[in-house]
């Protein structure tokens, strides 16, 4: 599926929603606050959201937001990333399977059918 959002001027990074640093100092914000931030950002034209499996619970937070919102999916640009060391202990013949499994886990956490 292709998103209608081909070019974004701003992208909201979500590492601060899932790890213990960022917008609240030394700890992650409550999920309700993070969802409010996502809602505010999207209502004000920030339709690109960046997250990652390595960002603690950030994918789950984004998923909670996306499950509650009525904004059309094709208006959003959601990006995520694999863990940096996902293939370290993996033989090359398993790369495809390991990457696919990781992406499917991200899709479940994000409540999406594509990224």
In which residue ranges do the predicted regions lie?
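N-terminal binding-site loop/beta-alpha segment at the start of enzyme catalytic domains
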Residues: 1-76
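Glycine/proline-rich, positively charged
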Residues: 43, 90-115
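Active-site mouth loops of central-metabolism enzymes
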Residues: 18-32, 82-100
């Amino acid at each position: 599926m292709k998103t209608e959002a081909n070019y974004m001027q701003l992208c909201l990074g979500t590492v601060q929603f899932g790890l213990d640093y960022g917008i609240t100092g030394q700890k992650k914000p409550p999920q309700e606050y993070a969802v409010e931030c996502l809602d505010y950002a999207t209502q004000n034209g920030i339709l690109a959201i960046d997250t990652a499996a390595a960002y603690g619970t950030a994918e789950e937070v984004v998923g909670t937001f996306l499950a509650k919102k009525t904004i059309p999916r094709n208006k959003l640009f959601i990006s995520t990333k694999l863990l940096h060391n996902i293939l370290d202990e993996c033989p090359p013949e398993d790369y495809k399977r390991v990457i696919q499994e990781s992406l499917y886990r991200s899709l479940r956490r994000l409540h999406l059918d594509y990224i």
